[in-house]
């Protein structure tokens, strides 16, 4: 049976076409120990400081809080359909003039970039096709002003 994966709202959803059933696995349910980041430890369902994920005044129950520069690689083996997430800098650092860039890489090619986001900006929607992609990388890069207070959320 052929299986497909769809990443939705920072989710990995497995849709089995033969049975007509779908199974959703949230990324925060996966092992994130291989994630690298510039400061602190990636947090599941919380900001990097352990608070509620909040971007531009909007809160999120699920996702991953990280700090630039960060990267997580996910092996998809060509079974993915799409990736969708809300991204931005967490409101916990809103008083700091900080910036970052969210980047999605598939098999070494840039699939999407947020451009530079700043503290206090509304969440940005990321939605990309992953047809045939074997390896997905989710990266948070410094926005050009140093990595200080770059508390970045994938929600």
What does each model-identified segment do?
Residues 4, 13-15, 52:
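N-terminal start and proteolytic maturation junction detector
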Residues 10-23:
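Bacterial Sec-dependent signal peptides at the C-terminal "C-region" and cleavage site
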Residues 1-8:
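Bacterial N-terminal signal peptides that target proteins for export
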Residues 21-155:
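Gly-Asp-aromatic-enriched flexible segments
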């Amino acid at each position: 049976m052929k299986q497909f994966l769809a990443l939705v709202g920072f989710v990995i959803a497995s849709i089995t076409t033969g049975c007509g059933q779908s199974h959703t696995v949230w990324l925060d349910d996966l092992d994130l120990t291989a994630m690298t980041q510039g400061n602190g430890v990636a947090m599941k369902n919380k900001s990097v400081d352990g608070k509620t994920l909040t971007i531009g005044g909007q809160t999120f129950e699920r996702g991953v809080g990280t700090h630039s520069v960060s990267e997580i690689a996910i092996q998809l083996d060509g079974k993915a359909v799409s990736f969708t997430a809300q991204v931005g800098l967490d409101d916990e650092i809103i008083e700091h003039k900080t910036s970052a860039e969210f980047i999605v890489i598939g098999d070494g090619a840039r699939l999407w970039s947020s451009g530079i986001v700043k503290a206090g900006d509304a969440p940005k929607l990321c939605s990309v096709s992953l047809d045939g992609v074997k390896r997905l990388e989710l990266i948070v890069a410094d926005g050009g002003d140093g990595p200080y207070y770059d508390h970045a959320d994938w929600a």
